[in-house]
């Protein structure tokens, strides 16, 4: 019992001997509350300057539909080479047979597409104009509602200006060859009369051309 009291006393003395530490004033405390910081305004982002483009404004929704349909068909045809340059197109056609052709983007500001073809004198490029909702080649008066009807016309013309297209893939899928053969046999105007299921009929109608 005495030993316990002695330990307690010693603890009491040592505790009392330690000086009390006053809490240091917080840097954030003050006599008056600090005003909330105002959010900095975001820097103004300058509007992007309109880039140069040869795509002009469509005059009607019908023109827009024709161009978007032509673009979709070009993506599916296999002989659309996109932004290939004139020099690049001519180099690819140089060793090909006469009549071989491809379609690419035109570099002219007033045209969407250009036709590059291997002629007897060498490769050449012709602008494809789109005016009043119709497509025609530069220097020709014959115009067509669809770009691929224009191509079919010059493939089947007596002078046979166009021959086989230069495809990016040399080996075509069998289903594309079958579709081309069916369209050539029955004609695209009769595709709806073929007794097929809707899936096959839609596939035939997605590219109803003989090219």
From Swiss-Prot:
Q: Which UniProt keywords apply?
A: Cytoplasmic vesicle, Disease variant, Growth regulation, Nucleus, SH2 domain, Signal transduction inhibitor, Ubl conjugation pathway
State any single GO MF term.
Answer: insulin-like growth factor receptor binding
What does the record list as coiled-coil region(s)? none
Residue segments, region Interaction with Elongin BC complex: 173-182
SOCS box domain segment(s) = 161-210
What is one GO biological process annotated to this record? positive regulation of CD4-positive, alpha-beta T cell differentiation
Compositional bias ranges of the Pro residues kind:
36-49
PROSITE patterns in the record? SH2, SOCS
State the conditions that upregulate or repress this gene: By a subset of cytokines including those belonging to the interferon, interleukin and colony-stimulating factor families.
As annotated in Swiss-Prot or TrEMBL, what is the tissue specificity of this protein?
Expressed in all tissues with high expression in spleen, small intestine and peripheral blood leukocytes.
Residue stretches making up the SH2 domain = 79-174
Q: Which CDD domains match?
A: SH2_SOCS1, SOCS_SOCS1
Q: What is the effect of changing residue 22 to W?
A: In AISIMD; loss of inhibition of cytokine-induced STAT phosphorylation, including IFNG-induced STAT1 phosphorylation, IL2-induced STAT5 phosphorylation and IL4-induced STAT6 phosphorylation
Region annotation (Kinase inhibitory region (KIR)) maps to 55-66
What ranges does the record list as Low complexity composition bias? 25-35
Q: How does it assemble?
A: Interacts with multiple activated signaling proteins of the tyrosine kinase signaling pathway including JAK family kinases, TEC, KIT, GRB2 and VAV. Binding to JAKs is mediated through the KIR and SH2 domains to a phosphorylated tyrosine residue within the JAK JH1 domain. Binds the SH3 domain of GRB2 via diproline determinants in the N-terminus, and the N-terminal regulatory domain of VAV. Interacts with the Elongin BC complex (ELOB and ELOC). Component of an ECS CBC(SOCS1) E3 ubiquitin-protein ligase complex which contains Elongin BC, CUL5, RBX1 and SOCS1.
Q: How are the domains described in the entry?
A: The ESS and SH2 domains are required for JAK phosphotyrosine binding. Further interaction with the KIR domain is necessary for signal and kinase inhibition.
Q: What is this protein called?
A: Suppressor of cytokine signaling 1
Q: Which organism is it from?
A: Homo sapiens (Human)
């Amino acid at each position: 019992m005495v030993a316990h009291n002695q330990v307690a006393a010693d603890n009491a003395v040592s505790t009392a001997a330690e000086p009390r530490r006053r809490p240091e004033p917080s840097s954030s405390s003050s006599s008056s509350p600090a005003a909330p910081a105002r959010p900095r305004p975001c820097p103004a982002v300058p509007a992007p300057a309109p880039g140069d483009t040869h795509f002009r404004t469509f005059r009607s929704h019908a023109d827009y539909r024709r161009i978007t349909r032509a673009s979709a068909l070009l993506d599916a045809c296999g002989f659309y080479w996109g932004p290939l340059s004139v020099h690049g197109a001519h180099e690819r056609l140089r060793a090909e047979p006469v009549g071989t052709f491809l379609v690419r983007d035109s570099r002219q500001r007033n045209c969407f597409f250009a036709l590059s073809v291997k002629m007897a004198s060498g490769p050449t490029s012709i602008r494809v104009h789109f005016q009043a909702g119709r497509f025609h080649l530069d220097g020709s008066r014959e115009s067509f509602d669809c770009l691929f009807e224009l191509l079919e016309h010059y493939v089947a013309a007596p002078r046979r200006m166009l021959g086989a297209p230069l495809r990016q893939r040399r080996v075509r899928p069998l289903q594309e060859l079958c579709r081309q053969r069916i369209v050539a046999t029955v004609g695209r105007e009769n595709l709806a009369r073929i007794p097929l299921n809707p899936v096959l009929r839609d596939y035939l109608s997605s590219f109803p051309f003989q090219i």
